[in-house]
Amino acid sequence: MPLDPDSSPAPPHRDWFFPPAPPFLPSSRARTPRAPFPSTSRSSNPYSFPDRRPPPTPRSRSRSPLPPPEQQKQQQPPPTTPPPAPRRRDPRYAGVRRGDVRTLTAEKAAAAAAVPTAAQVHGSKSAASATTLRWSGMVSVAAIVLCFSSLVRSNSSLHDQVHHLKAQLAEATTKLQSCITESSMDMSSILSYQSNNSTSQNRGLKNFSLLLSLSTLYAPLLILKYMDLFLKLRSSQDSEEEVPINKRLAYRVDIFLSLQPYAKPLVLLVATLLLIGLGGLALYGVNDDSLLDCLWLSWTFVADSGNHANAEGFGPKLVSVSISIGGMLVFAMMLGLVTDSISEKFDSLRKGRSEVIEQSHTLVLGWSDKLGSLLNQIAIANESLGGGTIVVMAEKDKEEMEADIAKMEFDLKGTAIICRSGSPLILADLKKVSVSKARAIVVLAEEGNADQSDARALRTVLSLTGVKEGLRGHIVVELSDLDNEVLVKLVGGDLVETVVAHDVIGRLMIQCARQPGLAQIWEDILGFENCEFYIKRWPQLDGMQFEDVLISFPDAIPCGIKVASYGGKIILNPDDFYVLQEGDEVLVIAEDDDTYAPAPLPKVMRGYLPKDFVVPKSPERILFCGWRRDMEDMIMVLDAFLAPGSELWMFNDVPEMDRERKLIDGGLDFSRLENITLVHREGNAVIRRHLESLPLESFDSILILADESVEDSAIQADSRSLATLLLIRDIQAKRLPFREAMVSHVTRGSFCEGSWIGEMQQASDKSVIISEILDPRTKNLLSVSKISDYVLSNELVSMALAMVAEDRQINDVLEELFAEQGNEMQIRPADLYLREDEELNFFEVMLRGRQRKEIVIGYRLVDAERAIINPPDKVSRRRWSAKDVFVVITEKE
């Protein structure tokens, strides 16, 4: 069969994979292969790769490489059958063979293997393309700036030419209309020529000014934008990454604005000057005015954005609008700076950060529940001076302190209270409140743990003594523990006066338990509302005996002498025959320091005592409800005061073994107790059945202590004390004999007959209850209800602090009156000094008291509710009753 490719058509089974040729493709003759395709039998398992032999790769137009001839010979199987006749091939698929599938797969694998190499090439070229783009951007920005500059320059040139033509036209018109001589016309033409020459000379300067302003404006922006690019090009690729110049510049600006106090106003001033200067240069480039006029015009555009409305021409209008926009930004910045400055100033004033410029003021350091009473007492003391200044510094917000003080609602009486926020441990804060110029510094104890509070007070004293300017006034320190007093005085030296609040309340409770009524007397003496202690020198009294000095003051009561020869020591209740020497001062009880003065001796009758006897002491039974930190000190003081055979019952929830251990650790020696016997009872003071186990009706005095071992806050301790008080009074009222008869005799008043409060008031006739109240508000509540005989609170401590702050010498007097040795304040019956219905004036009663080595300072009538200290009219005679009582200062027995 002849192999004619044109005569025989392509067999249909050869085109089973390829689609028919499109009609528009031209037909071409296929190339004749050099060797015919081998005839192979189809395997029964076409997917069995080990038995499958690939056909030899024919020569085609494919780019895949052909194996060498030796390999082709090895791969070609021996012919088993004669080769078939060559068939006509489709010209559309010339060069494509069925055996090329593996070759195509190899080509795809090679192409896939070549892909990572192309990606690497592309990545290596990305940096170069980015650099090219950045340079292209730089060139574009520079071209835009140059185009804009050329447009502005062309516009200004056209504008100048128009003006020049108008000027020439006006000149020509003038020449035609006027009839002037030829010489004058020649002169005007010469002047016009000179002006044209000067205009052409100034035009170059104006163009330079315009370009200078634009370049100055855009050059920093371009430098900042492309500075990092320059640095990256100069640095090597292996070097460490550096911080961009933009970030470094922003950091430097931030540091400058943060550290320099005047940085923001300085930046605003520089920005304003740059805007005026660049705007003036730009206006000079587009206007015919002089440079000074353009600078002034630029300032007017900055100051008032509406001034650019009169500009003519495109160039002047564009520059004017730009300057006005910059001026608005500058004034917005200035407004923001002014607003921030005013806000910071008001915020500083609101938070109490400003300095106090005061002198001879009272400085209070710290914050506690005693602050209200302290401020009230100091304000009353300053009333005679026309008011004063009190500065309070604590670690609280100023507004919060002012709000708390406003809630106290007491009359300041002309005294100004200034609050500042700060720490007394920081010298800068102490200088802020003018600590060196204060006449007195009061350090309040913190609420909470006593040792921590005293430790902080000690650090505060160290800070105060470290002030370089020195202290003009003295330091009054409130301590919580008596054991820490020695350490604080050791650190502070002569500048420090201490008031141990816990010890003061404990000793007052013991005195009031022995002599009911002393609490009210101490409130009158310690407070500035009535009479208090004053020390003053009176030269006219030198050479006079103390017995005569005693009756020399119609409006005061002398109590002691400050002896100059003893180094200023104060002697309470001196001997009658002591003669005042030069430099001695007199201690008196008076209403104020300017309300008393010595007067001539009055005429008095010196009588004799009705009987000379010593008031016998009888054994007493006292109950302590609760536990205090200084219980051992109270026991020792009570043992010194009571008669032999007395009993002290201790009722609290502290186990008995723990009580003995705490008392021994506190320094109590049980073997040294001579007059009292301790009786321990364990129980809860707010549980009724526990209280009913006690013989409450047999106690002479009951002391309800603020149980600090159970409660932490003052309000919780007061609530517990109030509950104990009500339970004890109710149990006593139900145990009294003839309760119904006694209740029926209750005086009609605030409470109706048979009420439980009336029963409690009747029960108070049998025993006295002394309640320790920490919060003054609770004290006022109990005082109004009258269910407790006497209430002692922190208000007494505040009074003592205020008195010592006004005069530090009074602290020695108070310490002696509170101590178990020396002189004390007592209440005596009237029959010790006079007879029934005897008429005497107060001076004569005072002289009767001197026969017992006592100083009578006041009295309380039988039908009166309160005692009168320092009676106003001491020369008026009156009839006394044997049931009246006198308040005296006498030596402890």
Curated annotation (Swiss-Prot):
Domain RCK N-terminal, chain residue ranges per copy: 359-500, 619-792
Tissue and organ expression note: Expressed in roots, leaves, stems and panicles.
Annotated SUPFAM superfamilies: Voltage-gated potassium channels
Membrane topology classification: Multi-pass membrane protein
Regions crossing the membrane: 132-152, 210-230, 266-286, 318-338
Regions of compositional bias (Pro residues) in chain numbering: 65-85
Keyword terms of this UniProt record: Coiled coil, Ion channel, Ion transport, Membrane, Nucleus, Transmembrane, Transmembrane helix, Transport
Null mutant phenotype: Defective in mycorrhizal symbiosis.
Region (Disordered): 1-94
Role of this protein: Required for mycorrhizal symbiosis.
Protein name: Probable ion channel CASTOR
Organism this protein belongs to: Oryza sativa subsp. japonica
